[in-house]
Amino acid sequence: MVVRSLLRVSRLTSASCRHASLAVSSTPKPYIPSVTGVQKSMPFDNLLEQYSRVHWDDSVTYDDPNVQKLFKSLMSGSRAALASAITLVESRHPTKRAQGNMLLKMVLDEEREKYKKFGRDSMIFRVGISGSPGVGKSSFIEALGAELTENRGKKVAVLTIDPTSAMTGGSVLGDLTRMQELSRNPKAYIRQSPTSGSLGGVTRGIHEAVILCEGAGYDIVIIETVGVGQSETSVSDMCDMMCLLLSPAHGDELQGVKRGIMEMSDLLVVTKDDGDLKAKAKMTQAEYISALKFMRPRLDVWRPKVMRSSIMDKESVSEVCSSLYEFWDTIGESGDLERRRQDQMKKWMWNHVKDEIMSVFQKHPKIAHLAPKLENEIRSGKITPGLAAETMIRTFFGV
């Protein structure tokens, strides 16, 4: 009897163990798609903390001597310090990037105090200028800069964005040769930056450069883009005003400009209003005035203007300049300026998140090890790009 009971207990225990084993084996495991030639193990999990120390530097503090020295020189209006500061915030080096972020925080704190004392008078006017190649952007900016510095007593900063070649990685950066007079003006500062393929054509540090120009005491910053496209959308997210330049020499100019570019523009200027093109410029102006009637203005307090200008006629440049500041006063009094600045800061936070995540993702040991193999699988047609992307993302998160 005792033996029979022991045998029954033994059988029950054995069955329980089998059920427990099945329960354990049925526990869901992390899903990793089956990809030929890719090792499914994750040997780099322990490197995440070390990798974060390579990518970010937390040792930079408010008392960093390099940051303090650069901050004092920048606040005194040094153009050399401004150039060094912009280079610092554009750097990808962890320590330099940390120093750049600390410098930006100090500048923003200082500008906040100035705003409490002087209000809108302490703020820099941000103007984006766009237009198709050959419209005369550089010549117009030089004429506008001369009007602002010589006749209106303003300090002008010009930030130009040149496209980076997708084939060679180089860029022309030729605006300094086209703005020779303005580059020699002591009240002007010109900085050229390649897009480096980031943010739809807007270089990574351009927004920070605007903040640094404000800290250096400049009254107006002009951001010039090359061509019309995605970069104009990004530039409009960091400017107070968008100015679109149009050329009467390009035939049917109205067909060559995207509706979205016109809708985000606050001022349209037909250039080269002189000589044989004067009649054509007047006709182009009339066409755009008519076209704008069918578009809703970006702001309720401002209806976009269409003007004509020629760098040969200083009075026409002065009229454009007056329209710029008419817009500035209008949005300042209505409260749209402060609201727009706040929205821009939020958008640029998410732009930086996207840019930073992509950089971290591509350089992470897991992905650096996995990506070349997945690329080979895509080339051989054994896996779709979508599945390869999912594999990398799930490998990165370990799920």
From Swiss-Prot:
Q: Which UniProt keywords apply?
A: ATP-binding, Chaperone, GTP-binding, Hydrolase, Mitochondrion, Nucleotide-binding, Transit peptide
GO CC term (a single one) = mitochondrion
**Annotated GTP binding sites:** 131-139, 274, 310-312
Recorded hits in CDD domains, A to Z, give:
MMAA-like
Q: Name one GO molecular function term.
A: GTPase activity
The record's InterPro entries line, in alphabetical order, gives:
GTPase_ArgK (IPR005129), P-loop_NTPase (IPR027417)
Q: Which residues are the transit peptide here?
A: 1-15
What sort of enzyme, by top EC class, is this? hydrolase
Q: Where does the record say this protein resides? A: Mitochondrion
Gene inactivation phenotype reads: Reduced incorporation of 1-[14C]-propionate. Defective in adenosylcobalamin synthesis. incorporation into macromolecules.
Q: What is its EC number?
A: 3.6.-.-
PANTHER family referenced in this protein's UniProt entry, alphabetically? METHYLMALONIC ACIDURIA TYPE A PROTEIN, MITOCHONDRIAL, METHYLMALONYL-COA MUTASE
Give the family per the record: Belongs to the SIMIBI class G3E GTPase family. ArgK/MeaB subfamily.
Which NCBIfam families does the annotation name? lao (TIGR00750), PRK09435.1 (NF006958)
**Task of the protein:** May have GTPase activity. May also bind and hydrolyze ATP. May function as chaperone. Likely to have a role in propionyl-CoA and adenosylcobalamin metabolism.
Task: List the protein's name.
Answer: Methylmalonic aciduria type A homolog, mitochondrial
The protein's organism comes out as Caenorhabditis elegans
